[in-house]
């Protein structure tokens, strides 16, 4: 895989990404307002250089205002709409795959009341509508809730991972490499967290 671009409003996040992917094009911008022309041109250039490659759009959407860690605090309605801004990227770059990472409560995305609190009877309504809208661009969708520690991360957080794939492209999630207790099995060993 070759990472060719990154958009993030946080300069520290961009600096970290640039250190790990120095050949990628970096934009320290808000995804809602980024002028897409340079990104579109860069992707077109990469498609010519690598005509058999798949274009994957990875989005780690802001999660603070979905997370249960927010407790009973009011949510920022604007921050909860960042997923809606994905559509202009889909239309501009027509990726083969879209991969999403977020807190598992992202699936409960629904309306807020006048005090900024989630309306329980609407839990999941906006999420389901959003998934249907992305699928309307010709994608199929599968999601999983995965524990990052099962894949070698130094934290044991359960996270939402969603994959949208065009047409008949395969959707595959990785097999775990670790487990809480570790295990030896017929097909290999799972390392202990």
Predicted regions and their residues:
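SAM cofactor-binding core of SAM-dependent methyltransferases
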Residues: 1-35
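Residue-level recognition of the N-termini of beta-strands and the immediately preceding loop/turn
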Residues: 2-4, 53-56
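Short glycine-rich loop/turn motifs that provide flexible caps or phosphate-binding loops at active sites
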Residues: 4, 59, 151
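Anionic group-transfer/hydrolysis microenvironments
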Residues: 10, 32, 62, 103-104
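Redox-cofactor binding/interface segments in oxidoreductases and associated redox assembly factors
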Residues: 29, 58-59, 100
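Class I S-adenosyl-L-methionine
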Residues: 37-53, 63-193
